[in-house]
Structure formats: C-alpha cells, structure tokens
Amino acid sequence: MSGQGPPSNLTPQQQHMIMQQQQQQQMMRQQQIQQQQLHQRQLQQQQAQQSYQRSRTPQMQQHPGGGSPGSHLQMHPHLQSQGHMQPRSPLVGQHHPAPGSIPPGNPATPQMMQQQMGMNQPMSLPAPHVSRPGSVAPPASVPPNMHTGPSSNQMDQMGGQSQYSHHLQPQQPLSRPGSQQSHIAGGHGGPHSVQQPGSVLAPGSIQQPGSLLAPGSMHQPGSVQQPGSLGAPLSHTGAGGPQSVQGYGPGSVQPPGSAQAPSSVQPGSTFAPGSLQAPASQQPPASIQPPPSAASGSVAGPASAAPAKVEPLKPNEEQIRMVQDPVDLVRNLVQKDLRMSVVEMNKRGAELLHQKEEGAIKEEDRQQYKRATNDFHAVCDEIDRTLTTIMETAKQITKLDKVFQDRTSKEIDGEAMVNSVQKFVDETGIVQKMFDDTVNSVTSTMEKMRRRQKKWKDQQQQQENAEDAEMAE
C-alpha cells in the first residue's frame, strides 16, 4: 500500500486516511530502527556505568608488600578513559534528568527502559506503539544547557538535517476518529518549534507545552474537521520564516481538511498565522475588536472632550476663602473688607443722622444702614472664625507633636504610645464637640430668627388687611 497512491475516485477524507496510514507505517519502521539504536546505546551506557562503579567501589583484596592499602582507589576521574567519564548523557543535568536517560548508580534494564518509554507515550497512540523515540537520550554533541524541557523537546533542538524531511509528516500516529486527542492537552509546537535546517524532530514527539500551534501539529479528522472545510484545498503560508511549509499533500505539514475547529482550541493558546483554522475561527472577534475599539476611542475622544470646552462655573467668594491660607485670608479681610464695611456703615449712619435732624427719615436709607451694619458684623465674624481656626490648629499640632516626640531618637513602647494617642484623641473629641455645639447654636438661632420674621410678616399682613377693611367701611 505504501508504494501505491490513493485511487482518484475516493473522497478527500478517504485519501487523507490512506495517506495517514502510509505515513504511520513509515514511522513504525523508523521507530523500530531507533529502538534498536536505543538498546545499543543503553547497553554501552550500562557497561560504562558498571565499569565506573567498580572503579569507585573499594575492593577487599590483598595488597603486596610495600603498597598502600588504598592504592587501588587512587585512580582519579580525570585519569580515566573517556568512556568512564561519560556515564550519563550530556543533556542530563544534575537537577533535570531527561526521562529517557540513565542516572548514575542506577543502571536500567531494557524492560525498565520500555516501561519509561511507555509512560512518555501520548494517550492517543494505539496499543502496538509501546515506545516513543522522543525518549531516546540525546547525543553528546548537544550543549549541556539544552535540557529545559522533556526529552522530546530536547530532540527538537539537536541533530542534523538528515531527518528534515520528516518534519513534513504528521507528528504523531492517527488515533481512531471520535476519540479525544491527547495532543490537545499535551503540547503544541509554536513557530519556533518548526525545525530549522539544523534541527531534527523525531516522529511522534510532543512539542513544548504552552507554545503556539505549529503547522506541524496533526489533529484527528473526527475532532478537528468541519464539513465546510473538507473540499477545497486549504494552502496557507506559514509565518515561521524560511523554515515554514506551504500547501498540503503526502508530505505537507497539515493534511487537507485538517482545519482547526473551535472544539480543539486550547485555553490560553493562540494560533500561528500559518496554522489552518476553520472558517468560523479564521477571523475571531478578538482580531476584529482592536480596530473598532481604537476607532471608537478616537471618535469618543472629541465627544468626551466636548463637555470640557464648556466654561466652568466661577467659584464664589466662599469657595475661594476655603482654599486660601487662613493668615492671608485674615489679612485681606482686615485690610479690605473690614475697612470698606466700616466706611459704608458710617456713611449710611451719617445720612440717617442728617435726616433725623431734619425730622424726615426715609425708609430706604434705614434699610441700607441695616444692610451695611450686617455686612460689618459678617466681616467681623469671618475674621473671628478664621483666627479661631488658626489658634485651634496650632494647639492641635502642638498636641500631636507631643505624641510623636523623640520618636526619631528612640522607640516608644506600645503602652506609652497608646496613652499619648488616646490623650490626643480625647482632646480632639472635645474640640469636635465645641464645633458641634457652635453649629447647633447657630442653626437654632437662625431657625428662631426665621420664625420671628415669619410671625412679624403675618402680623403686618393682618394689620394691613384690617386697615383696608376699615377704609372700605
């Protein structure tokens, strides 16, 4: 079957299945060859490890006269042969051993290696595929700093260009249609996992987890295809650089119709531009949202800035006084408001005295004198309130300084600190009570004054009505 192409009368999906089976058989043969190489390498490492352990273990033997008892232990590691110096793979670090490597002091048997390779196998692999070539220990030509991921990830970064043609094949055997694919939960090769000419990817290896979906990732036809994406050839250019692959076919990165469906979208992962996606997910809302949001933001900018162009209300005199320095406020009140109010009050009073001497006092001049007198009293009250605020603030600052005195030179224990703060809080409460009493007194006075004014107006209205009634009679 591997030497013949699929019949032309088959549907694209059937042709895809036939090509997958052919590629699967090729990968099985490659896996058998790599397993044999693995066994040979394991035997060599095991022999080297046993020899290394024997050279490091003291032996109970008779020493000839004149020789030191520990002369047979004087062989240093730097004097041994190169085979004894490499009991482990160069990629196996001290704290990050590769899954397929043999740790020192614990030689593994072929059965144990088969068990380890079986554990590294994806869940979607069929039963005959027991081992994965991804668990093969990397060669000694790889630098020691390339051991950050699983062994299959290490193999993605090493090797030569001899197996570069395998990158065009699916990365893992096809499982039954409808079964869940462990590639979804396993790993996804990003654009960086598309192998460069100097890298080799073993068939069936799992890409690095958390990375972007690579063009080389393979998905099940039953779980990733949609009816609308099975017919037309979907040839997309990968965005991974010169190493990316275009089109599809027997050696393409993705089979025809293997569009990425929404059901296989991994949480927290994004798709590379070269990955094929379903028509419903080729243009996700997230890729369309930024331009409208930017446009709407630019449109909403002038609209939101329009209210700022409206001229703000000018603050009244009371608001200006609240944000001023109290000392400056008192100075302005004394130098300007107080003087003007005194002059105005004296002027109105002089006019009333002149009219009184003449014997005819105008009601309008009397009201103006009352208004000038009220203004003078208001200025005096404002000065008194501001000076009181300044003095009370100075007292509070002095009390607060006593609470934190000598704090920079020495630490105050908890009890003394609580006592000082409690005293300050009590004194602050007394001042607050004084303010509350003053406000309540002013409020009650204003209420009484308004009630009296209303009562006086009612009496005046009744008198006018009575006078009108008498005149009418």
From Swiss-Prot:
Pfam families: Med29 (PF11568). GO terms for cellular component: mediator complex. The keyword Transcription regulation applies. It is found in: Nucleus. Signal peptide: none annotated. Its main location: nucleus. Residues 1-319, 444-473 are annotated as: Disordered. Component of the Mediator complex, a coactivator involved in the regulated transcription of nearly all RNA polymerase II-dependent genes. Mediator functions as a bridge to convey information from gene-specific regulatory proteins to the basal RNA polymerase II transcription machinery. Mediator is recruited to promoters by direct interactions with regulatory proteins and serves as a scaffold for the assembly of a functional preinitiation complex with RNA polymerase II and the general transcription factors. Component of the Mediator complex. This is Mediator of RNA polymerase II transcription subunit 29.
